[in-house]
């Protein structure tokens, strides 16, 4: 009887909290932002950063990254507390908060649907389903008993979500237990990632192939509208439990914390995301007050600066510039199975190395990034565990050495047209995938100029980003430029791009090297510190020896925001719109 009364009180308190949270999400407060087009709002089928940003407002994981913590720190989200770890690090037990509910869906048949441990069992199973973007081989082998269930779904068979997995089970309604085959120091960060957020099985099954566009989560926002290639609209979740702005003792964050203290979040009732593919229209929309903040780089950043300061007209409006190191690496991968640039022979490696040495990274930083980038000298960017600060940030650009290397391995101009042939006398032509955007046209021109300088003919195949991704997954691109952003401080996702067991979506070059694989697997079992740096350095050395990718730049981020945007912090791993607020009086005074 006492237990029943306590449960009733807990439910009533949860309802009151939800109502209070909804009352604080003001429909008049509309956050206006931009994004390139998104591909999927299914958390287990969303890999690009822009889809991740939107989906992260809708779905919730057991854990999340603290918004303000530096260095990054994992904290509970829907979990009651941090995991209880026993069994020598191999048994993780996690209790869920009670009273969290999914937003309404016809799949729930008019009844409230509480989040339970079984939802995370189902969602983690989806994240290892090989039919969904190839699954997650590393996680599959980490969870005890998962491999046979995953293998039974190959090739093309449906994943059996009812098949028990010994290492993944709900031991009661609110308790999840994960049993591991080995210690893995990245698991906690994985549990804070989008692919481990909770979906409801009945929603997924009802939506079928439309699940990418029918998201139903427990997060602070829910999808109201999605017009492809036009806009996405989110509205505050009326059932959200509400939260307080994070605390911090860092001196540079004190004014921010004080301004947000006491507010129940989310404060913003509606988020309007305009799909804008080009940076110049993005900047124009911001300048006209149609966007509340905007990220800029390269020439577009130079359009708003005089030297290193904002132009007077922007400064007079109170626009703030935030500059920060972004855990991003930009690279061009080589398809290791391509007959021209692929392979592991000395001549094939020499060709890739010469191409990498022939591209002027410093010039690309000046021309394309307005100086706001760093030459990538290793796989992991600054701010990520494993990055070696002792390595000088410089590129390997050396066109004379590139030409000499090509000559040495028989790539010579046999017909006098200024372009080299292969050692067996066949035409040598590089083909890069590229996008129909102004930035990429400049990038393509730089590539062609640099390759002309070392005597290699280069052509491009121009498609939309989605089409290029599909071609990449099918192994039909010779070369393609990609940007990978580490979504957690361990950097394992970036290192995973050269792990041979990753699906093509995760390892687009299809690089395979046993030494690299061993170093990567050891990295997962090594805590943050010097050991990780040593292993990451080893993987970088292996990648530079075989050159499956040409490393280009590390990112520097720049965000401009109007003074009515409150709560903004350039959190590299914990950013969420739920922490923001809009000062309507300031916006009205500015006439925006």
PLM-predicted stretches and their roles:
Residues 28-37, 90-95, 120-123, 176-177, ...:
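Short, well-ordered beta-strand elements
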Residues 29-31, 35, 182-185, 215-216, ...:
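Detector for C-terminal structural segments
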Residues 34-87, 216:
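N-terminal lobe/hinge region of extracytoplasmic solute-binding protein
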Residues 68-69, 149-175, 179-272, 277-281, ...:
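Gly/Pro-rich hinge or "lid" segments in bacterial periplasmic/extracellular proteins
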């Amino acid at each position: 009887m006492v237990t029943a009364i306590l449960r009733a009180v807990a439910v009533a308190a949860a309802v009151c909290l939800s109502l209070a949270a909804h009352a604080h999400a003001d429909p008049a407060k509309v956050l206006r932002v931009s994004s390139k087009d998104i591909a999927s709002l299914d958390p287990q089928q969303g890999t690009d950063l822009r889809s991740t940003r939107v989906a992260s407002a809708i779905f919730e994981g057991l854990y999340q990254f603290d918004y303000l913590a530096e260095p990054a720190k994992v904290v509970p989200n829907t979990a009651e507390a941090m995991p209880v770890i026993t069994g020598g690090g191999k048994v993780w037990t996690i209790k869920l908060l009670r009273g969290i509910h999914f937003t309404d869906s016809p799949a729930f048949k008019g009844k409230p649907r509480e989040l339970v441990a079984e939802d995370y069992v189902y969602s983690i199973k989806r994240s290892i389903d090989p039919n969904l973007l190839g699954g997650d081989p590393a996680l599959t082998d980490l969870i005890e008993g998962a491999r046979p269930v995953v293998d039974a779904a190959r090739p093309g068979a449906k994943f059996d979500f009812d098949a028990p997995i010994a290492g993944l089970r709900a031991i009661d309604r609110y308790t999840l237990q994960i049993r591991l085959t080995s210690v893995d120091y990245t698991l906690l960060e994985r549990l804070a990632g989008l692919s481990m957020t909770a979906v409801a099985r009945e929603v997924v099954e009802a939506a079928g192939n439309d699940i990418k566009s029918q998201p139903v989560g427990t997060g602070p926002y829910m999808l109201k509208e999605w017009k492809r290639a036009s806009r996405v609209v989110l509205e505050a979740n009326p059932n959200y439990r509400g939260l307080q702005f994070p605390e911090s003792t860092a001196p540079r964050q004190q004014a921010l914390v004080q301004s947000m203290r006491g507010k129940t979040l989310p404060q913003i009732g509606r988020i309007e995301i305009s799909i804008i593919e080009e940076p110049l229209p993005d900047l124009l929309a911001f300048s006209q007050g149609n966007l509340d903040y905007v990220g800029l780089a390269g020439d577009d950043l130079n359009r708003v600066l005089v030297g290193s300061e904002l132009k007077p007209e922007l400064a007079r409006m109170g626009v703030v510039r935030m500059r920060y190191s972004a855990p991003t690496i930009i690279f061009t991968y080589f398809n290791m199975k391509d007959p021209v640039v692929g392979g592991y022979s000395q001549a094939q490696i020499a060709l890739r190395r010469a191409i990498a040495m022939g591209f002027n990274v410093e010039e690309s930083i000046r021309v394309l990034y307005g100086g706001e980038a760093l030459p990538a000298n290793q796989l992991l960017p600054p701010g990520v565990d494993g990055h070696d600060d002792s390595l000088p940030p410089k590129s390997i650009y050396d066109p004379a050495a590139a030409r000499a290397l090509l000559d040495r391995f028989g790539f010579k101009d046999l017909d006098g047209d200024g372009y080299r042939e292969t050692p067996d006398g066949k035409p040598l032509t590089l083909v890069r995938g590229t996008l129909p955007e102004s930035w990429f046209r400049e990038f393509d021109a730089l590539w062609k100029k640099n390759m002309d300088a070392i005597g290699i003919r280069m052509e491009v195949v121009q498609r939309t980003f989605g089409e290029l991704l599909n071609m990449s997954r099918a192994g039909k691109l010779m070369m393609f430029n990609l940007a990978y952003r580490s979504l957690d401080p361990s950097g394992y996702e970036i290192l995973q791009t050269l792990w041979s067991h990753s699906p093509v979506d995760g390892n687009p070059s299809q690089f395979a090297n046993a030494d690299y694989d061993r170093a990567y697997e050891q990295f997962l079992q090594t805590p943050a510190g010097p050991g990780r740096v040593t292993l990451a350095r080893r993987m970088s050395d292996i990648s530079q020896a075989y050159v499956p990718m040409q490393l280009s730049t590390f990112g520097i981020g720049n965000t401009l925001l109007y003074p009515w945007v409150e709560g903004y912090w350039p959190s590299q791993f914990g950013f969420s719109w739920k922490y923001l607020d809009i000062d309507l009086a300031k916006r009205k005074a500015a006439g925006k």
